[in-house]
Amino acid sequence: MPHSIDMEDSSAIAERSKHAGLALEPEACFNLPQPTAEDRQDNWQTQYHSSEGAQGGSRKAQAADATTGNPTVDDASQQNGLLQQWVKQGYFMPAEHGSKAGNDVKHKYSPPKSDVWGVLVACTVITTWAALFYHSIFQIKLPSIEQLRSGNYNPSDFTSWPHVLLAFFSLEFLYTGLFITTHDAMHGTIAMRHRKLNDFLGSFAISLYAWFDYKMLHKKHWEHHNHTGKVGADPDFHRGNPSILPWFARFMMEYSSLWQFAKIAWWATGMQLLGAPFQNILMFMTAAPILSAFRLFYYGTYIPHHPEPGPASDKVEMDWTMSRTSTAPSLLSFLTCYHFDLHWEHHRWPYAPWWQLPVCRKLAGRTNPLHTEALQTAEPSRLEHGG
């Protein structure tokens, strides 16, 4: 059983939460009563200690998982120790931790026991993006816009279009990976035990992506997790028009700023001074990240959280428990958006890194009644709950 968190620890957590946009008192972190529909910020320690008993003996649960082929289940005390570390670093998500949704499977997942894999995955994404970015910006030869208009150029003097398209879509996919890396950092899942390293990698990745402000993203993302699907409270949710294009436009405006555009202009100018052609900058530094942003929005916001069509769909709230989850094979889910389409699992286990979300999907199965209830209203497609 992990040691109890004293008030000094919880005060520090409250202070971190305040910086992240949540006005939580120390008692709000650990000593709230059982959740209601309006307030689901219950006692974290009670919740996870009770899950120990719910397992009916952690060793038996491990044996059961071994026979069914499910991922290994750590005992509750080990899980509590890891999650306690997560909470002490200031990554508490009260709206989700206090929810009863998925309580029957919540205790089965434990975060990685080491930060090595998280850091290695993040660095692999960043360095692979950097290598392809350099090749795309400085080594690919594109005809100028004027040459394309007039048709007065020799194709053999330039990089073949199949090569260009392969580089473009590969780089766009890696841009998406940069954002997913930052998203993991905001949840502390790159380096759970080393907050400074975790936040450095997240901030660095989002600067390479499009010079977003990491602290602003972190604050708004906490708001999203605490008020998922609530009009006017969730910064990712629509503001009264759930149609895809107006929602995407508002989504982009929510996170953009003049200072960000100034930094992008500075970055592009620097690339030109180093010899990058304008057409390469336009294609690989402008079009690719914009397409990536739409990919992230579509699979990480619109599909999981959009309300069902109807006369009052603009007023329907989409609590996180109603998030849709893809049933696509793991490889396709990865190629789609780094498993960002496994969205119910992400909200149930916000301390799971993106590369372990397929594990969470296996653990979730269809054991939670909320999955099947929500499935009745989900759109008839491959996207459903608890796949």
From Swiss-Prot:
Name of the protein in question? Beta-carotene 4-ketolase
Q: Could you tell me which PANTHER family the record lists for this protein?
A: DELTA(5) FATTY ACID DESATURASE C-RELATED (PTHR19353:SF19), FATTY ACID DESATURASE 2 (PTHR19353)
Ordered alphabetically, the record's keywords are:
Carotenoid biosynthesis, Oxidoreductase
What GO molecular function annotation could you give as one example from this UniProt entry?
A: oxidoreductase activity, acting on paired donors, with incorporation or reduction of molecular oxygen
What gene, per UniProt, encodes this protein? BKT
Q: What does this protein do?
A: Involved in the biosynthesis of ketocarotenoids which are powerful anti-oxidative molecules. Catalyzes the conversion of beta-carotene to canthaxanthin via echinenone.
An annotated GO cellular component of this protein is: membrane
Species the sequence originates in: Protosiphon botryoides
Bias (Polar residues) ranges: 43-53, 65-78
Query: Which InterPro entries does the entry mention?
Result: FA_desaturase_dom, Fatty_acid_desaturase
Say yes or no: keyword Membrane present.
no
What are the start and end residues of every segment in region (Disordered)?
A: 1-78
List GO BP terms, alphabetically: carotenoid biosynthetic process
Q: EC class of this enzyme?
A: oxidoreductase
Q: Which reaction does it catalyse?
A: echinenone + 2 AH2 + 2 O2 = canthaxanthin + 2 A + 3 H2O; all-trans-beta-carotene + 2 AH2 + 2 O2 = echinenone + 2 A + 3 H2O
Its organism's taxonomic lineage begins at: Eukaryota, Viridiplantae, Chlorophyta, core chlorophytes, Chlorophyceae
What EC number(s) is this enzyme filed under?
A: 1.14.99.63
Functional pathway? Carotenoid biosynthesis
Top-level division of the source organism's lineage = Eukaryota
Can the keyword Mitochondrion be found in this entry's annotation?
Answer: no
